[in-house]
């Protein structure tokens, strides 16, 4: 088994991080981000990894290849503002997927509106406080290390003073949903049905 080490991800890792997220579709194909393609993911992570409130831990093998990552924003409101500030570049990156599948435009628009703290905004993700985001690992590598990686990320957050974190999990993502309930002992706050019919637990 190859040696795996953990470190904080940097903006220069955006391409590899996006590639790992893209390969999640080998196990789970749902989600607007996967629908928008790898080019969009690269543009997104280039922005996210440069956000001062982002904590992203990645796992790296002895060849320097990133095998997985887990990330959390310590300020979901600031992150939403940052994403909206880059809406043009993200829109351009998503354009190819939207041209191929015009129905995606409605989903993208709803997701964009959900970034607002307005009472009328769609409730799809948490938009305030500390928000857990993605936890991804390449399919053919030592996935047990992914749990260690996630725990390290959470320990860093704890050391930084975080005592409460919100996140969302689609019920269809059965293994992750059960892990958070039974192992992480996460407490469901709300269950919603997304416009595309997916059931999401927050």
Which residues does each PLM region occupy?
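A short beta-loop-alpha structural element at the N-terminal edge
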Residues: 4-20, 74
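A short helix-loop-beta-strand connector motif used in the catalytic cores of GNAT acetyltransferases and
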Residues: 43-58, 74-82
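Conserved GNAT acetyl-CoA-binding A-motif
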Residues: 127-132, 157-171
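Conserved acetyl-CoA-binding loop-helix of GNAT-fold acetyltransferases
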Residues: 129, 133, 137, 141-158, ...
């Amino acid at each position: 088994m190859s040696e795996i080490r953990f470190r904080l991800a940097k903006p220069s890792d955006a391409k590899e991080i996006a590639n790992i997220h893209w390969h999640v579709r080998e196990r789970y194909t749902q989600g607007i981000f996967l629908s928008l393609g790898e080019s969009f993911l690269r543009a997104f992570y280039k922005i996210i990894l440069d956000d001062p409130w982002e904590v992203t831990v990645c796992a790296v093998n002895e060849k320097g290849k990133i095998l997985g990552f887990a990330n959390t924003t310590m300020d979901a409101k600031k992150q939403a503002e940052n994403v909206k500030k880059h809406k043009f570049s993200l829109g351009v990156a998503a354009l190819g997927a939207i041209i191929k599948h015009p129905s995606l435009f409605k989903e993208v628009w709803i997701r964009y509106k959900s970034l607002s703290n307005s009472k009328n905004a769609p409730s799809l993700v948490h938009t305030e406080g500390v928000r857990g985001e993605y936890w991804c690992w390449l399919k053919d590598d030592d996935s047990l290390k992914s749990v260690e990686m996630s725990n390290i990320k959470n320990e860093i957050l704890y050391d930084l003073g975080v005592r409460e974190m919100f996140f969302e999990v689609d019920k269809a993502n059965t293994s992750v949903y059960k892990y958070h309930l039974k192992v992480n002992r996460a407490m469901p706050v709300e269950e919603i049905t997304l416009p595309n019919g997916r059931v999401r637990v927050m």
